[in-house]
């Protein structure tokens, strides 16, 4: 088999429709839906949505990804995205902005770019972290917290067919030929 240099947006196909599921889940929510907590120690649905956006921006900024610096600058005006956790329009705006940054990088990078590393200090050690590791970290973060969001909304009796029942999968694989 010949190794191909594939555009990352092709490799991560499906993540884009998961983003649509996140937006569709958050967009219709009221302030009451966004601030409700099942337990005082858990994040609210609004805090979860803000955390998803902030996680994307933070991790892509760590690897020096284009557009991340501009979003970090915009974030400074908020202090933290938790400040918008009660506003569905702002949450959707940041989900879309952070996804736009992710998508532009996935469109620009190919599989050969996955092995580029950056230095990341953590708990007294300095790690050589690859783009592959970081992108997988962000995918896992989106999926984990998207599931958490689905549960928080489900506990409130809010149906989330895309994010819940379909697991965020809006794109179906092609039908097999007979």
What is each residue range found by the language model?
Residues 21-24, 28, 97, 101-108, ...:
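Solvent-exposed, charged/polar functional surfaces in cytosolic regulatory/catalytic domains
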Residues 12-16, 20-26, 33-78, 120-178:
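Short, contiguous alpha-helical
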Residues 108-124:
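Acidic catalytic patch
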Residues 1-14:
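Extreme N-terminal tail/first-helix region
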Residues 1-2, 79-84, 126-127:
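Short glycine/proline-rich turn/loop motifs
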Residues 61-62, 67-107:
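Helix-adjacent hinge/juxtasegments
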């Amino acid at each position: 088999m010949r190794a191909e240099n594939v555009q990352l947006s092709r490799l991560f196909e499906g993540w884009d429709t998961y983003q649509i599921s996140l937006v569709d889940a958050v967009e219709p929510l009221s302030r009451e839906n966004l601030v409700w907590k099942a337990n005082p120690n858990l994040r609210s649905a609004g805090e979860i949505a803000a955390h998803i956006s902030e996680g994307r921006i933070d991790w892509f900024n760590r690897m020096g990804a284009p557009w991340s610096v501009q979003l970090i600058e915009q974030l400074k005006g908020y202090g933290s995205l938790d400040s918008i956790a009660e506003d569905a329009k702002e949450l959707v705006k940041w989900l879309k902005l952070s996804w736009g940054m992710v998508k532009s990088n996935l469109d620009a990078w190919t599989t050969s770019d996955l092995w580029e590393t950056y230095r990341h200090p953590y708990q007294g050690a300095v790690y050589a972290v690859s783009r592959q590791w970081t992108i997988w970290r962000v995918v896992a973060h989106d999926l984990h917290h998207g599931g958490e969001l689905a549960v928080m909304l489900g506990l409130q009796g809010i149906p989330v067919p895309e994010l819940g029942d379909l697991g965020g999968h809006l794109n179906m694989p092609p039908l097999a030929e007979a």
